[in-house]
Amino acid sequence: MMIKQSPFLLLTTILFTVAVFVAALDPAPEDPIFELYMHDLLGGSSPTARPITGLLGNIYNGQVPFAKQIGFTPPENGIAIPNANGALPTVNGINGVPLGTGLSGTAYSGQNLNGIQTQLGPDGLSLGFGTITVIDDILTSGPDLGSQPLGKAQGVYVASSADGSTQMMAFTAMLEGGEYNDNLNFYGIYRIGSAMSHLSVTGGTGRFKNACGFAEVRPLIPSGQHEVDGAESLLRIIVHLKY
């Protein structure tokens, strides 16, 4: 005796089989991933970052007696007046980069010398603690400063740890060239001297509206193919997105 199969059951079985087959051929797309290279230039003739508060900001703005943009040299027989915590203002006389905080730690003539001990004031805090630095950094498709420009990173980073080892970063990547032509917002803690830090993607505009995800931030040594007279910090930013 044969059991008559329901046409509805047969159709359901066929549709399920087709759906499984299509899913196997066309898996769900992976989250978009792309790279940015951020060039942060402190000091020199064409800086893209400038401290605006704290001791370092006072030096740049000429608010500390005898401080000059390209060096700190008191007049002959003159006595420098210390700032509020008793520390003397200090500036690299070669390119105007303060001996203090940046994305590469203490900067001397464009060299990354993260091994140098951070200068501390009488209160035990680094001289750059609390310094807010405004950035208009260049974003490129490759690690060289002459690579294809993708846009600008505009925002701030703040020396947020007492020992000068971290920077709180908040900036918008304004992507004006290449495949992407919209804005992404980033926020998080960058650890100076660490092999990798993570920033959160906190949204965006245009194509990246309601975007979320994270970015892996790795410090690199600048290639030096494009000579600059300031101190360059180079960051490789790998962005993982969902939107």
UniProtKB/Swiss-Prot annotation:
How is the quaternary structure described?
A: Homodimer.
Pfam families under this entry? Dirigent
InterPro entries, alphabetized? Allene_oxi_cyc_Dirigent, Dirigent
Principal place where this protein is found?
secreted
GO CC annotation, single = apoplast
Q: Where in the cell is it found?
A: Secreted, Extracellular space, Apoplast
Q: Which residues form a coiled coil?
A: none
Name-wise, this protein is Dirigent protein 16
For the keyword Secreted, the answer is yes
Task: Spell out the family assignment given in the record's similarity comment.
Answer: Belongs to the plant dirigent protein family.
Keyword terms, alphabetized: Apoplast, Secreted, Signal
> Per the UniProt entry, what species is this protein from, by scientific name?
Arabidopsis thaliana (Mouse-ear cress)
The signal peptide, as residue positions, is 1-24
Give the protein's biological function: Dirigent proteins impart stereoselectivity on the phenoxy radical-coupling reaction, yielding optically active lignans from two molecules of coniferyl alcohol in the biosynthesis of lignans, flavonolignans, and alkaloids and thus plays a central role in plant secondary metabolism.
